[in-house]
Regions:
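Gly/Pro/Ser/Thr-rich low-complexity, intrinsically disordered segments predominantly at protein N-termini
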Residues: 1-130
Length: 130
């Protein structure tokens, strides 16, 4: 397992398009992959059992609340979002208001949706620095 993220740097001539990055992530589903606004790619190993359990509990609680509330939808840690900076990030749990989600096209909803969730949870791992 990778204890801290592996950062890949690419020259501007080798930057991936959004579609290429999405395909790269699909081909490497066993890894947690994010991209920052500068095109640098962070590769993290899958979560350990303890972290996976905490993620599952947090996501479950958010999902139960969302189902009762009925005004939005939840997303698991395997979901990527394209932020306004161009970065693609995957929080440990996310929630988006239905009215905002429904403004996206089906094509946008299918890939890394170009939207910043209304609520996110990101667990701090042992390798994260503050």
């Amino acid at each position: 397992m990778i204890s801290s993220p592996l950062i890949l740097h690419f020259p501007s001539s080798m930057q991936m398009t959004d579609d290429q990055f999405f395909q790269f992530c699909q081909e490497n589903r066993d890894l947690r992959i994010e991209r920052n606004q500068f095109g640098e790619i962070s590769i993290m190993s899958p979560a350990g059992s303890e972290t996976g359990n905490r993620e599952g509990n947090i996501f479950g609680q958010l999902w139960v609340w969302s189902e009762k509330d009925g005004t939005g939808i939840t997303f698991s840690p395997s979901t990527g979002f394209t932020l306004s900076t161009g970065a693609e990030r995957s929080p440990d749990a996310a929630w988006i208001k239905l009215e905002r989600w429904n403004q996206l096209t089906p094509k946008q909803q299918k890939k890394f949706a170009p939207i910043c969730p209304d609520f996110v949870i990101k667990l701090r791992s042992d390798s994260d620095n503050l």
